């Protein structure tokens, strides 16, 4: 009996090793090498044209990719429009603030690709978003990297599926680590991806608690740089519309760089979830390292983005190539 059990275990082990994770195995940088060989150049051109219209395209696209991948995987389900019978992901409260320019650049790139007969209905919206995300990072002077392709578009998008799957502005390191671990991402990946906050903006309503009503002892979060706290109070007075936008990075808001970590060292992290990366002993060494070593940070960011792009990838069995990125076929 023991010998039989051993044979079964060995057989199963061999079977598992012979059939790796198909969702990862299907991804490759030249996935469209035969069907649409110029896909990267076409998407890049659209991205560049869109950025000329508005800088918001850069942070909007980067944030859209993250929000998509963290809810049911990188399958462009965040792009689906709600219908009378289905409230989609994009209409969940956590996604309402996603800027339209991120959606628009994907839609425009899809249109440009479909205008080429050999590419028409061949490239998934999920892959377009992944490519556009790399291109906006590069446009902001961030690192370039090869994008793995071969994702299929998701067949489901519900607002309910967003619940509890996206990090919040008040999360602590333990909460962040658990959330990222669900997607096979490490603490180092979490810190690297958090640095996407070197770009873009947030809304005043997300920081009111840190600058006016932190706790019973302190009105202002004591981990906030005092001068920075006053700047935030001027930008976000108590009576201001909570939707008013403020820069995530007060120093270089239009450039992808490691200044994000230097800001944390000075108490200038906008969200609690940013500043805790420096105040928590588990993550502080990494923050200090990347604050002085941009090469190490860029390398870690590329690794994290590649791993993020593999989360929940759909195959031909549970996905398709959407004709309209905002609607199911």
UniProtKB/Swiss-Prot annotation:
Keywords, alphabetical: Calcium, Disulfide bond, Glycoprotein, Heme, Hydrogen peroxide, Iron, Metal-binding, Oxidoreductase, Peroxidase, Secreted, Signal
Main location as per UniProt: secreted
Binding residues for heme b: 197
Cysteines joined through disulfide linkages: 36-119, 69-74, 125-325, 204-236
Residues where substrate binds: 167
Binding site for Ca(2+) 1: 68, 71, 73, 75, 77
Tree of life domain: Eukaryota
Comment on bound cofactor: Binds 1 heme b (iron(II)-protoporphyrin IX) group per subunit.
Tissues in which the UniProt entry reports expression: Expressed in the whole plant, with the highest expression in roots.
Pfam families documented for this protein: peroxidase
Catalytic activity: 2 a phenolic donor + H2O2 = 2 a phenolic radical donor + 2 H2O
Residues annotated as site: Transition state stabilizer: 63
Gene Ontology biological process terms, A to Z: hydrogen peroxide catabolic process; response to oxidative stress
Induction: Up-regulated transiently by a cold treatment.
InterPro entries referenced in this protein's UniProt entry, alphabetically: Haem_peroxidase, Haem_peroxidase_sf, Peroxidase_pln, Peroxidases_heam-ligand_BS, Secretory_peroxidase
Cofactors required: heme b; Ca(2+)
Membership in a protein family: Belongs to the peroxidase family. Classical plant (class III) peroxidase subfamily.
Note: There are 73 peroxidase genes in A.thaliana.
Identification of the protein by name: Peroxidase 73
Organism of derivation: Arabidopsis thaliana (Mouse-ear cress)
Gene that encodes the chain: PER73
């Amino acid at each position: 009996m023991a010998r039989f059990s051993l044979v079964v275990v060995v057989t199963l082990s061999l079977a598992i090793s012979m059939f790796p994770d198909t969702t990862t195995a299907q991804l490759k940088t030249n996935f469209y090498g035969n069907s649409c060989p110029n896909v990267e150049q076409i998407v890049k051109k659209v991205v560049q044209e869109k950025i000329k219209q508005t800088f918001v395209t850069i942070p909007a696209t980067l944030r859209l990719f993250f929000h998509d991948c963290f809810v049911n995987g990188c399958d462009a389900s965040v792009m689906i429009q709600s219908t009378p019978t289905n409230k989609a992901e994009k209409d969940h409260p956590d996604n309402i603030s996603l800027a339209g320019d991120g959606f628009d650049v994907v839609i425009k790139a899809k249109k440009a690709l479909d205008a080429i007969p050999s590419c028409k209905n061949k490239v998934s919206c999920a892959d377009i978003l992944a490519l556009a995300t790399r291109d906006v990072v590069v446009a902001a002077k961030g690192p370039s990297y090869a994008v793995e392709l071969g994702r299929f578009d998701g067949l489901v998008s519900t607002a309910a599926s967003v619940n509890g799957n996206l990090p919040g502005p008040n999360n602590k390191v333990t909460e962040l680590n658990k959330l990222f671990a669900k997607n096979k991402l490490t603490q180092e990946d979490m810190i690297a991806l958090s640095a996407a906050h070197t770009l873009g903006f947030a809304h005043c309503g997300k920081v009111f608690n840190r600058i006016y009503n932190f706790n019973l002892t302190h009105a202002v979060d004591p981990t906030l740089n005092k001068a920075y706290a006053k700047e935030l109070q001027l930008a976000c007075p108590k009576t201001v519309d909570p939707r008013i936008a403020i820069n995530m990075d007060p120093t270089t808001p239009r450039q992808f760089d490691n200044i994000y970590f230097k800001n944390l060292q000075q108490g200038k992290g906008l969200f609690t979830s940013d500043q805790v990366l420096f105040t928590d002993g588990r993550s502080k060494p990494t923050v200090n390292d990347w604050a002085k070593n941009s090469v190490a940070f860029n390398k870690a960011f590329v690794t994290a983005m590649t791993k993020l792009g593999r989360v929940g990838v759909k195959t031909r069995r549970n996905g398709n190539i959407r004709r309209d990125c905002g609607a199911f076929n």
